[in-house]
Swiss-Prot record:
Keywords: Neurotoxin, Secreted, Toxin. Expressed by the venom gland. Transmembrane segments: none annotated. GO terms for cellular component: extracellular region. It comes from Scolopendra viridicornis nigra (Brazilian giant centipede). Belongs to the scolopendra toxin 7 family. Signal peptide: none annotated. It is found in: Secreted. This is Scolopendra 6940.74 Da toxin. GO terms for molecular function: toxin activity. The lineage of its organism: Eukaryota, Metazoa, Ecdysozoa, Arthropoda, Myriapoda. The keyword Secreted applies.
Amino acid sequence: FKSLTKYSPGRQN
């Protein structure tokens, strides 16, 4: 979920 990066930056990316 790339959208989750907005809430948790550094988690998915």
